[in-house]
Amino acid sequence: MAGAVSLLGVVGLLLVSALSGVLGDRANPDLRAHPGNAAHPGSGATEPRRRPPLKDQRERTRAGSLPLGALYTAAVAAFVLYKCLQGKDETAVLHEEASKQQPLQSEQQLAQLTQQLAQTEQHLNNLMAQLDPLFERVTTLAGAQQELLNMKLWTIHELLQDSKPDKDMEASEPGEGSGGESAGGGDKVSETGTFLISPHTEASRPLPEDFCLKEDEEEIGDSQAWEEPTNWSTETWNLATSWEVGRGLRRRCSQAVAKGPSHSLGWEGGTTAEGRLKQSLFS
């Protein structure tokens, strides 16, 4: 601003000097051209006025044109300076307006962001409203499946408990038959009069019926300890499967017991045949 004021002062001085020169040159051109006529005004009034020569007119026009050019240049310089100062003022005003517009723009951006957040919240609420019935259906289906599994396991447990008395009866019947046959074999040997094979050795050998009876007792204890779990998990399911595997093994054992009397008869027949051979040799 100080530089602009100094330039304006210089331009003002140039304008004043140019104006003073122009006004001084044009004030009295006749006196400058003929200075001697001023001393004799009376004679000049009677004589006719003479025209100045052409050279003087040309010099006068040149002298008048020079101050006009200076005035023109000074005016142009002043206009340029004015525009420059006006441009600086405009830039300052623009900066001020920009500084004022920045908070307005930030406020507008915040308002837009809040609107976007509100829209996203609405979308999320709509999605949750659509997903809630799906979650409810899934939970109901899972509960129904769990109830079905519990019912199936409960029915399996009841069937196993119902089948245990039948197994006990089957296990007791083969035991009685083998006992009677063994008693008959003892009588046959006693009729010969020689006891080459003692009855203690036969009694000391464990029969498969004893194994099956022990396993049945263990199964009864397991069934008493086994209770229906309210909530089935993977661990209880694994226990149930291992228990079913043991049940299959016990069933095979009971089948072997059902076939046992024939094997026991063959074994007793073999022992009686060996006794007869030894008796014939000693006799």
Swiss-Prot record:
Subcellular location as annotated: Membrane
Compositional bias (Gly residues): 176-187
Chain segments annotated as coiled-coil in the UniProt record: 104-134
Keywords per UniProt: Coiled coil, Membrane, Signal, Transmembrane, Transmembrane helix
GO cellular component, one term: membrane
Ranges annotated as spanning the membrane: 65-85
Classification via InterPro entries: CCDC107
Principal location: membrane
PANTHER family assigned: COILED-COIL DOMAIN-CONTAINING PROTEIN 107
Protein name: Coiled-coil domain-containing protein 107
Native source species: Homo sapiens
Gene (name only): CCDC107
